[in-house]
Amino acid sequence: MGAGVIALDWDLRPLNTEGLYVAGSTSTETYGSAAAATGRYAGRKASTYARTISEGVISRGQIEKEKARIYAPVTRKDGIGWKELKAGLCRVMQDYCNEIKNEEILNIGLKWFESIEECEAQEVYARNPHELARVIECFTHLTMGKVIIHACLARKASSNGLIFNRLDYPEVDPPEWNKFITIRKENGEIKTRDLEFDYWLKPPYAPTYKENYDEHCDL
């Protein structure tokens, strides 16, 4: 599918997101080094943040809505099981977001995910806590599948460094596409943003790794 992670600042915080910190494989594409180095760093930043803010206002309506979504599978006695749902999601990714991509096939995959979300995902059941956990994982996989396809559609060029091949855009690493493409959902719409490959060394950050680490490490 290609390389892709959460875009972070020097506090290991998703860009423009307060109070959320990221560690491990979701924070970098440097394989095992992330697991060895980012947990303690992100923990320090989260601890510092927690000590400097007041208690937030809880949205009871949001909590009840999420509880209804999460526990809906345990209210069903029949339908489809989590294994069937997971197999369907994997098949969509295998068939429509494989190593070689193009816009038509990616859009078909996106329509399949939307159909599964509206139909099969509303019929899945869970008979015990174990099955409920697997169902929730499937819901997350469904969301991430859509995120990945939207990201693939946004990058209209192939790239060796990003392990990304577009059949309809075969030129590899054209200069105008030497950048990251981030996506977010805003008011129900998918928005994109360009970031330089070394944005973490550009203003408002310092130009060197050491300067940034010294400023942000909280040691």
Where are these regions (language model features)?
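Glycine- and aromatic-enriched mobile tails/lids
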Residues: 3-22, 26-219
